[in-house]
UniProtKB/Swiss-Prot annotation:
Pro residues: bias regions: 820-833
Gene responsible for this protein: BOC
Organism listed in the record: Homo sapiens (Human)
Start and end residues of each Fibronectin type-III domain: 474-571, 608-703, 712-812
Residues exposed to the Cytoplasmic side: 877-1114
Protein name as catalogued: Brother of CDO
C-alpha cells in the first residue's frame, strides 16, 4: 500500500513542482503589483514612569516584515537592556523611563519597497507644583455670578481641577457651582451664603497625583444700588485654540445691578439660532468644532445703566485641523533616463510640514531630487530610484501620509515605441517619458528622417545588455545664451567624438522649461540622431529658460548637456512712443530707427547676470552656468563666482575670478560633501563690477553621511514693523538658535496679507536668507493694514509661525489738491499755437507736475512782487530827487548859473497855441493866455511867460480874444493901457530874502518848460515889466501870501518877436548884451536884473505879482 502511494507520488512529481513554481511566480508578481500600506497606525501614548506601553501596527499585505524605529534609529528586535519587546508587529515597553520615551515608527518591508508609519510619541506623565500666590478677595454683587479662577500647574496630560467648598472637595458641577473646562469655578446667583474661603487642587488622571494650591481666595457678596454692567471674566481679550471635532466653551461672566443681559455675536453677526451653538447661562458652547467656527466672537453685557455697548470682550478662536494628504496615483512606471513628478496635496491648519521618504528613508534636495511642499521631481530615473515614495505631513495636532509605488522600465523599448509613434503619426519620436506623464508635450518638426528602428543584439557596436556599451558623451551646444526673438529659440548642437569605439547615437532627448521659483513640468522632445537643430516655440518674452539634452545609444542615456537662455523682451508701445518722441525732440532730423543705436553717454558698470544654474560635475565639484545682461556701454572684461554655505552664517566667499567673457560656465571644485551651497555671479568691465546676480537654488553636494536634520520647531520673533511709504513695510526680527537645539536653518519665510482677509490663501510669501534679520515688503496697497508672520526653515521643513504683527501702509500723497488753482472765470485760456498742436510732446518733456503747481505760482507771485519793489524804489528816489532839484532850480542862486545863460525848458502843456493875423500867443495848461513880453531899455526883448489859467490879454492889434476855461491863479493886466499895482505878486521862497535880490516863481507841479520858436512877425510896441533889484517884500495881512514889489521899467523899442520861455536866473550881466541895440538872444522872464554898469532901466511904476505858496511835496 505504501509502495503504491510512493509510486503515485513519484508519478505526480513534475506536476506538483510546476504548480509550486507557478504559485511562487504568482506570489512574486502579486508582491510587485501590491503597494505596501500601514492600515493601523501606532497611537501616541502618555504613561507614568515605570508603566507599560503597547504600540500596535497593522500592515497590508500582512506577510510583510515589520520593524520599529525609535527617534529615527532602527531597533534590532527585542532589547532587554532597553526594556523593549517586539512580537508580530507589536512593540511593548515593559517599564517606561527616560530612555524609552520618544517618537516610534513601524516600518513594513517587502521586495517592492518599504513604508513607514506616522510617528507615535510616547511621553512620561507628570504634574508640577502650583506657583506661589497670595490670597485674593473677590467681590460680587448679590444675584450675579461670581468667578473663582484657578491657575492650574503644568501637567501632562492636562490636569483636572477640584475645589474645596465649605470644607468639602467638589470634583464636578453641583447646584449653583459650575466647574468649567478652563478650571474656573462659577457661582451662579451668588448670595450671602456663598461667602467664604475657596481653594483649588489639580489631579493628574495618569499618575493619580493631587496637588493643592498654596493660597485661598475669599468671596464677598455685597448689596449695591444701580450699577452699570461690567464683564468680570475674562478680564481681557482671549485667543483660544481648539482641535477640529472637539467641543468649546467660551466663558463670559458679567456683573451689575440689575443683573445684565449677555449677548454673543460672531464676526459681527448674532449667533442666535446657530445649530452648533448653545448657551450655558451666559457662556457660549460650540459642539464639534470645524474650520468654519474660526473667527472673532464678541460678548456684550448691558443692563440699561450707563452707556450701552461699554461692556464688551472679544474671543479669537482658531480651529486647528490635523493634516490630510492625498496623492493622485498609487503606482507609476517611468522608463530609465526620464523624469518623474509626484504631486502631494496637503491640507491642515496650521500648514503642515512635509517630509518625503523613499523606502522609509527621508530624502533631501540634490541635483536629481527637487523637493517642494507639494511635489517631488526625480530627474534621470534609474533602477536605483525604484521603491515606495511617501509624502508625510505633520503639524501640532496630528500627522498623515500618502504612498505611491514608483517603478522603472528598461530603455530598450524606446526604439520600438519611437518606431510605432512615427509610423502612426509621421512626426518625430515621442520621448518615453510621455508615457509616464501625459501632460508633457512633444515639440518638433514633422517629416523628419527616421533613425534606425532597432539594433540587433548580435551587433558588435550595440550589445544587448545595458552597461556593456559606453554611454554617449554630452553633445556640444552651439547656440548663444541670448536671443532677440520673444517667443522662440533656435537650439543648435553637434555630437562630441562620434565614433571612437562608442555605440552609435540612436536619438536625442531635449528637455526645456521656464526657470521659476516653483518647478514647472519639462517639455520633452525626441530628436533623430541625424538632426542637430531644434526650434523651441511658444516661449514667454523676457523669460529665462533652462535646457537639458542627452544622447541615447543602446547603452541608455548618455551624459547631459545643459544651457540656459533668455528670450527677448517685448517693448511696450508707450515706451517706444516716448523713445521716438524723445529722439525727435533731441534731434528733429533723426529717424526713429536711430533709437537702436547704443547710448554711449550713459556709461556704467555691467548689469547683474541672470540667476546661475548648478549641475553636478563630480562628487565634490559643480558647474555654474549663467547668462550675462547689459554691459553698461563697455565690453565685459571678466566674471567672478561667489558661494555661500547655507547651514553656516557668514558672508559670500569668492570661488573664482578672472573668468574670460567668452566662458559662461565654470567648474567649482573642493566642495564639502553633504553641505548645501548657493552661488552667485558678478560681471566686470573697466568702470567696475556689477551687482551680484540672484543666488542660485540651494545645491547639496552628494556623498553625505545620511544624517537628517530635524525641522526647526520654534520660529523667529518679529520685533519691529514700520511703514516706509505707501507701498513698503519694513520689519525686523530676532531668531535664537538655542530655541531649536542649534538646528541649522536655511532662511526665513515671511507671510503677509490684508488684515481684513480671513482666507489663508491670500497670504503672500517672501523668502529671506538665514543671515538676514530685516526685510522690506514692497508692492503693497496704500493705506492698507497687513498681517505679517514668519517661519524659519531648513531641509527638514518649516518651523511654527512667529507672532503676528499688524502694520498699515502710509496714505498716498495728494496730487496738488490744496494748491490747485480755481478754473478761470474772466477769460478763457488762449488756444495753443498750431505748432504746439501738431508737434507731439514726449514723456520726457519738461512739464510741470500737478504737485509742483502751487509752489510755481507762489514763486512767480513773490518774484513779481520783489521785482516791482526793486523797480519802484529807484523810481521813487529819482522822483524825490527830481522834485528837490526842481525846487532848488527855482530858487535862482546867483552863483549856480554859468555865463552862457542856460535855461530849462518848461513846456506849458494844455491847449495848443494859436495865431491870429500873424500875431503869436501862448496857451496855458488849463486855459489860453496871451504871452507878455518884457522889454528892456534899448530894445532888448526879455521873453514871454505864459501862466496857467490866465485870461487872454490883448497885446497886439487884431489879436483874437481868448476865453479861459478855468479860474485864473494869476491875474495880469496890460501894462501899456493902465497898470494895477495889486495885480502882480511874486511869491518868495521860504528861505529867500529881499537882500539876495532874487525872487521865486512857484509853478504848478505838472508844469514843464516850453520852447517857442521865434517869429519874424512883429508886434506893436509893448510895455513889459522887469523886476528891479531894489524892491520890497511884505506879507498881506491874514494871508499866507508873500508880496514882492518892484518898479517895472518900460521901454519903447522896435518890433519884437516872442522868444524863448526859460525859467532861470541870469548869473551875470554878460548874459545879456544891450549895447549897440543888439537883441538879447535869451533872457529869463521874471529874473532879477541887477544895476550893473552898462545897463540902464527906464523908470516906471511899481509892479506887484502875487502867488500862493503851494505845499511842499516830495
Amino acid at each position: 500500500m505504501l509502495r503504491g502511494t510512493m509510486t503515485a507520488w513519484r508519478g505526480m512529481r513534475p506536476e506538483v513542482t510546476l504548480a509550486c513554481l507557478l504559485l511562487a511566480t504568482a506570489g512574486c508578481f502579486a508582491d510587485l503589483n501590491e503597494v505596501p500600506q500601514v492600515t493601523v497606525q501606532p497611537a501616541s501614548t502618555v504613561q507614568k514612569p515605570g508603566g507599560t506601553v503597547i504600540l500596535g501596527c497593522v500592515v497590508e499585505p500582512p506577510r510583510m516584515n515589520v520593524t520599529w524605529r525609535l527617534n529615527g534609529k532602527e531597533l534590532n528586535g527585542s532589547d532587554d537592556a532597553l526594556g523593549v519587546l517586539i512580537t508580530h508587529g507589536t512593540l511593548v515597553i515593559t517599564a517606561l523611563n527616560n530612555h524609552t520615551v520618544g517618537r516610534y515608527q513601524c516600518v513594513a518591508r517587502m521586495p517592492a519597497g518599504a513604508v513607514a508609519s506616522v510617528p507615535a510619541t510616547v511621553t512620561l506623565a507628570n504634574l508640577q507644583d502650583f506657583k506661589l500666590d497670595v490670597q485674593h478677595v473677590i467681590e460680587v454683587d448679590e444675584g450675579n455670578t461670581a468667578v473663582i479662577a484657578c491657575h492650574l500647574p503644568e501637567s501632562h496630560p492636562k490636569a483636572q481641577v477640584r475645589y474645596s467648598v465649605k470644607q468639602e472637595w467638589l470634583e464636578a458641577s453641583r447646584g449653583n457651582y459650575l466647574i468649567m473646562p478652563s478650571g474656573n469655578l462659577q457661582i451662579v446667583n451668588a448670595s450671602q451664603e456663598d461667602e467664604g474661603m475657596y481653594k483649588c487642587a489639580a489631579y493628574n488622571p495618569v499618575t493619580q497625583e493631587v496637588k493643592t494650591s498654596g493660597s485661598s481666595d475669599r468671596l464677598r457678596v455685597r448689596r449695591s444700588t444701580a450699577e452699570a454692567a461690567r464683564i468680570i471674566y475674562p478680564p481681557e481679550a482671549q485667543t483660544i485654540i481648539v482641535t477640529k471635532g472637539q467641543s468649546l466653551i467660551l466663558e463670559c461672566v458679567a456683573s451689575g445691578i440689575p443683573p445684565p443681559r449677555v449677548t454673543w455675536a460672531k464676526d459681527g453677526s448674532s449667533v442666535t439660532g446657530y445649530n452648533k451653538t448653545r448657551f450655558l447661562l451666559s457662556n457660549l458652547l460650540i459642539d464639534t468644532t470645524s474650520e468654519e467656527d474660526s473667527g472673532t466672537y464678541r460678548c456684550m453685557a448691558d443692563n440699561g445703566v450707563g452707556q450701552p455697548g461699554a461692556a464688551v470682550i472679544l474671543y479669537n478662536v482658531q480651529v486647528f485641523e490635523p493634516p490630510e494628504v492625498t496623492m493622485e496615483l498609487s503606482q507609476l512606471v517611468i522608463p530609465w533616463g526620464q523624469s518623474a513628478k509626484l504631486t502631494c496635496e496637503v491640507r491642515g491648519n496650521p500648514p503642515p510640514s512635509v517630509l518625503w521618504l523613499r523606502n522609509a528613508v527621508p530624502l533631501i534636495s540634490s541635483q536629481r531630487l527637487r523637493l517642494s511642499r507639494r511635489a517631488l521631481r526625480v530627474l534621470s530615473m534609474g533602477p536605483e530610484d525604484e521603491g515606495v515614495y511617501q509624502c508625510m505631513a505633520e503639524n501640532e495636532v496630528g500627522s498623515a501620509h500618502a504612498v505611491v509605488q514608483l517603478r522603472t522600465s528598461r530603455p530598450s523599448i524606446t526604439p520600438r515605441l519611437w518606431q510605432d509613434a512615427e509610423l502612426a503619426t509621421g512626426t518625430p519620436p515621442v520621448s518615453p517619458s510621455k508615457l509616464g506623464n501625459p501632460e508633457q508635450m512633444l515639440r518638433g518638426q514633422p517629416a523628419l528622417p527616421r533613425p534606425p528602428t532597432s539594433v540587433g543584439p548580435a551587433s558588435p557596436q550595440c550589445p544587448g545588455e545595458k552597461g556593456q556599451g559606453a554611454p554617449a558623451e554630452a553633445p556640444i551646444i552651439l547656440s548663444s545664451p541670448r536671443t532677440s526673438k520673444t517667443d522662440s529659440y533656435e537650439l543648435v548642437w553637434r555630437p562630441r567624438h562620434e565614433g571612437s569605439g562608442r555605440a552609435p547615437i540612436l536619438y536625442y532627448v531635449v528637455k526645456h522649461r521656464k526657470v521659476t521659483n516653483s518647478s514647472d513640468d519639462w517639455t520633452i522632445s525626441g530628436i533623430p540622431a541625424n538632426q542637430h537643430r531644434l526650434t523651441l516655440t511658444r516661449l514667454d518674452p523676457g523669460s529665462l529658460y533652462e535646457v537639458e539634452m542627452a544622447a541615447y545609444n543602446c547603452a541608455g542615456e548618455g551624459q547631459t548637456a545643459m544651457v540656459t537662455f533668455r528670450t527677448g523682451r517685448r517693448p511696450k508701445p508707450e515706451i517706444m512712443a516716448s523713445k521716438e518722441q524723445q529722439i525727435q525732440r533731441d534731434d528733429p532730423g533723426a529717424s526713429p530707427q536711430s533709437s537702436s543705436q547704443p547710448d554711449h553717454g550713459r556709461l556704467s558698470p555691467p548689469e547683474a547676470p541672470d540667476r546661475p544654474t548648478i549641475s553636478t560635475a563630480s562628487e565634490t565639484s559643480v558647474y555654474v552656468t549663467w547668462i550675462p545682461r547689459g554691459n553698461g556701454g563697455f565690453p565685459i572684461q571678466s566674471f567672478r563666482v561667489e558661494y555661500k554655505k547655507l547651514k553656516k552664517v557668514g558672508d559670500w566667499i569668492l570661488a573664482t575670478s578672472a573668468i574670460p567673457p567668452s566662458r559662461l560656465s565654470v567648474e567649482i571644485t573642493g566642495l564639502e560633501k553633504g553641505t548645501s551651497y548657493k552661488f552667485r555671479v558678478r560681471a566686470l568691465n573697466m568702470l567696475g563690477e556689477s551687482e551680484p546676480s540672484a543666488p542660485s537654488r540651494p545645491y547639496v553636494v552628494s556623498g553625505y553621511s545620511g544624517r537628517v536634520y530635524e525641522r526647526p520647531v520654534a520660529g523667529p520673533y518679529i520685533t519691529f514693523t514700520d511703514a516706509v511709504n505707501e507701498t513698503t513695510i519694513m520689519l525686523k526680527w530676532m531668531y535664537i538658535p538655542a530655541s531649536n537645539n542649534n538646528t541649522p536653518i536655511h532662511g526665513f519665510y515671511i507671510y503677509y496679507r490684508p488684515t481684513d482677509s480671513d482666507n489663508d490663501s491670500d497670504y503672500k510669501k517672501d523668502m529671506v536668507e538665514g543671515d538676514k534679520y530685516w526685510h522690506s515688503i514692497s508692492h503693497l496697497q496704500p493705506e492698507t493694514s497687513y498681517d505679517i508672520k514668519m517661519q524659519c526653515f531648513n531641509e527638514g521643513g518649516e518651523s511654527e509661525f512667529s507672532n503676528v504683527m499688524i502694520c498699515e501702509t502710509k496714505a498716498r500723497k495728494s496730487s496738488g489738491q490744496p494748491g490747485r488753482l480755481p478754473p478761470p472765470t474772466l477769460a478763457p485760456p488762449q488756444p495753443p499755437l498750431p505748432e504746439t498742436i501738431e508737434r507731439p510732446v514726449g514723456t520726457g518733456a519738461m512739464v510741470a507736475r500737478s504737485s509742483d503747481l502751487p509752489y510755481l505760482i507762489v514763486g512767480v507771485v513773490l518774484g513779481s512782487i520783489v521785482l516791482i519793489i526793486v523797480t519802484f524804489i529807484p523810481f521813487c528816489l529819482w522822483r524825490a530827487w527830481s522834485k528837490q532839484k526842481h525846487t532848488t532850480d527855482l530858487g535862482f542862486p546867483r552863483s549856480a548859473l554859468p555865463p552862457s545863460c542856460p535855461y530849462t525848458m518848461v513846456p506849458l502843456g494844455g491847449l495848443p497855441g494859436h495865431q491870429a493875423s500873424g500875431q503869436p500867443y501862448l496857451s496855458g495848461i488849463s486855459g489860453r493866455a496871451c504871452a507878455n513880453g518884457i522889454h528892456m531899455n534899448r530894445g532888448c526883448p526879455s521873453a514871454a511867460v505864459g501862466y496857467p489859467g490866465m485870461k487872454p490879454q490883448q497885446h497886439c492889434p487884431g489879436e483874437l480874444q481868448q476865453q479861459s476855461d478855468t479860474s485864473s491863479l494869476l491875474r495880469q493886466t496890460h501894462l501899456g493901457n493902465g497898470y494895477d499895482p495889486q495885480s502882480h505878486q511874486i511869491t518868495r521862497g521860504p528861505k529867500s530874502s529881499p537882500d539876495e535880490g532874487s525872487f521865486l516863481y512857484t509853478l504848478p507841479d505838472d508844469s514843464t518848460h516850453q520852447l517857442l520858436q521865434p517869429h519874424h512877425d512883429c508886434c506893436q510896441r509893448q510895455e513889459q515889466p522887469a523886476a528891479v533889484g531894489q524892491s520890497g517884500v511884505r506879507r498881506a495881512p491874514d494871508s499866507p501870501v508873500l508880496e514882492a514889489v518892484w518898479d517895472p521899467p518900460f521901454h519903447s523899442g522896435p518890433p519884437c518877436c516872442l522868444g524863448l520861455v526859460p525859467v532861470e536866473e541870469v548869473d551875470s550881466p554878460d548874459s545879456c548884451q544891450v549895447s549897440g541895440g543888439d537883441w538879447c538872444p535869451q533872457h529869463p522872464v521874471g529874473a532879477y536884473v541887477g544895476q550893473e554898469p552898462g545897463m540902464q532901466l527906464s523908470p516906471g511904476p511899481l509892479v506887484r505879482v502875487s502867488f500862493e505858496t503851494p505845499p511842499l511835496t516830495i
